[in-house]
């Protein structure tokens, strides 16, 4: 074959012209050990804490231990295929999850991947799972109510938008039920809800999703599921992922509610990861930074002022504040609130709703202990009519519990004590509420008005719930305008007071016929 010199010259020139002199500098390391979802990597001296490390199959690991000659990373996903000697690379990125309205009505895993079989998610962007909480200057005081629809909570331990209120109690005391009722009650309020399920049975999560669908509440809710079958790393990350999704709405001048169900299991998952990484154990074998684990998460729930919203949206949203309200759940063992994780979370949050097994088993549901439950900032945000009418409820219940214990030993009681006991029994009965049946502000106000003004004093204790149902039905049929006024304004003026008195007098008269 005859080679032409000019052809060879042209070929070489073309190759030189096409040559790209770009050098790609990639930090590469080698896996030296794989066990229980943890990889030890050598040669990644440039790795940063919390950085994503690319694994051979396209999966990622999270760098959590930076040692002198190796990096300890936790694998996000399957790790069975990883072998000693596999090459890994630094990415220079931190973990991000998809955010936006496209997530509403969907069930996703801790990384934001859909697991509900409804196809791809149309996200508006992505956000880092770890973010610094808003500073003091960016915050605004809590002064807007967040109604749960539960009489016992909205009257005694009111919640405000931007608050952190702990729900604490033993297993099977109705903690999740309170959270689900709160989500259902936000249906037409414009509040976006995020439900983060951590370490729960997949069947329990499916049951919650089905209940939200039945109540038509899934369309304003994002469910982040890290079930008991997922890795400890996923259970540890899930709350931060859910928080990032909620912050998207908060930073755009909207209101969001996030429920962490529950943070005890997240602490267990973090303890497991920390022990596998050979971190030194402390009290109850938790690592030294378990307080920071929860404080950096819960401090991100806040109400931010209009100026900060305007800055975050580059001037697109003006004159609106944004809020992220958190309802973390903690499971106690045999009512022990002095354990490590419960005391940590109690000290971080703005109050707690304490649920008792004894109350639950005696049929008082929601099983809220009025004496131990408190809302430190919600009082400033409480609706006026509920604040005025519900003021005596907590006192009546606290006095009743005290007197009931004393009355067990007393043979004869004076008239005043007997009346107080009877009033307490009726109030206790009135505070009972069926699951998945949240009440509006007006319905709540009517029930509290009846208790406050003595309308229940002539009703037998066992008939209180039936009396309340009949009363609310009567009000909906005959006094819808008054109820609309209460729901719209939330005020307790003379006109509302007169209207309620006339309505209840008419109901009593009708009932006596």
Swiss-Prot record:
<dbReference type="InterPro" id="IPR027417">
    <property type="entry name" value="P-loop_NTPase"/>
</dbReference>
<dbReference type="InterPro" id="IPR005294">
    <property type="entry name" value="ATP_synth_F1_asu"/>
</dbReference>
<dbReference type="GO" id="GO:0005524">
    <property type="term" value="F:ATP binding"/>
</dbReference>
<feature type="binding site">
    <location>
        <begin position="169"/>
        <end position="176"/>
    </location>
    <ligand>
        <name>ATP</name>
    </ligand>
</feature>
<keyword id="KW-0406">Ion transport</keyword>
<dbReference type="GO" id="GO:0005886">
    <property type="term" value="C:plasma membrane"/>
</dbReference>
<comment type="similarity">
    <text>Belongs to the ATPase alpha/beta chains family.</text>
</comment>
<dbReference type="GO" id="GO:0043531">
    <property type="term" value="F:ADP binding"/>
</dbReference>
<dbReference type="GO" id="GO:0045259">
    <property type="term" value="C:proton-transporting ATP synthase complex"/>
</dbReference>
<keyword id="KW-0375">Hydrogen ion transport</keyword>
<dbReference type="InterPro" id="IPR023366">
    <property type="entry name" value="ATP_synth_asu-like_sf"/>
</dbReference>
<keyword id="KW-0813">Transport</keyword>
<dbReference type="GO" id="GO:0046933">
    <property type="term" value="F:proton-transporting ATP synthase activity, rotational mechanism"/>
</dbReference>
<dbReference type="InterPro" id="IPR033732">
    <property type="entry name" value="ATP_synth_F1_a_nt-bd_dom"/>
</dbReference>
<dbReference type="InterPro" id="IPR038376">
    <property type="entry name" value="ATP_synth_asu_C_sf"/>
</dbReference>
<dbReference type="Pfam" id="PF00006">
    <property type="entry name" value="ATP-synt_ab"/>
</dbReference>
<dbReference type="InterPro" id="IPR020003">
    <property type="entry name" value="ATPase_a/bsu_AS"/>
</dbReference>
<feature type="site" description="Required for activity">
    <location>
        <position position="373"/>
    </location>
</feature>
<comment type="function">
    <text>Produces ATP from ADP in the presence of a proton gradient across the membrane. The alpha chain is a regulatory subunit.</text>
</comment>
<keyword id="KW-0067">ATP-binding</keyword>
<keyword id="KW-0066">ATP synthesis</keyword>
<keyword id="KW-1003">Cell membrane</keyword>
<keyword id="KW-0997">Cell inner membrane</keyword>
<keyword id="KW-0472">Membrane</keyword>
<comment type="subunit">
    <text>F-type ATPases have 2 components, CF(1) - the catalytic core - and CF(0) - the membrane proton channel. CF(1) has five subunits: alpha(3), beta(3), gamma(1), delta(1), epsilon(1). CF(0) has three main subunits: a(1), b(2) and c(9-12). The alpha and beta chains form an alternating ring which encloses part of the gamma chain. CF(1) is attached to CF(0) by a central stalk formed by the gamma and epsilon chains, while a peripheral stalk is formed by the delta and b chains.</text>
</comment>
<keyword id="KW-1278">Translocase</keyword>
<dbReference type="Pfam" id="PF00306">
    <property type="entry name" value="ATP-synt_ab_C"/>
</dbReference>
<keyword id="KW-0547">Nucleotide-binding</keyword>
<protein>
    <recommendedName>
        <fullName>ATP synthase subunit alpha</fullName>
        <ecNumber>7.1.2.2</ecNumber>
    </recommendedName>
</protein>
<dbReference type="InterPro" id="IPR036121">
    <property type="entry name" value="ATPase_F1/V1/A1_a/bsu_N_sf"/>
</dbReference>
<dbReference type="Pfam" id="PF02874">
    <property type="entry name" value="ATP-synt_ab_N"/>
</dbReference>
<dbReference type="InterPro" id="IPR004100">
    <property type="entry name" value="ATPase_F1/V1/A1_a/bsu_N"/>
</dbReference>
<dbReference type="InterPro" id="IPR000793">
    <property type="entry name" value="ATP_synth_asu_C"/>
</dbReference>
<dbReference type="InterPro" id="IPR000194">
    <property type="entry name" value="ATPase_F1/V1/A1_a/bsu_nucl-bd"/>
</dbReference>
<keyword id="KW-0139">CF(1)</keyword>
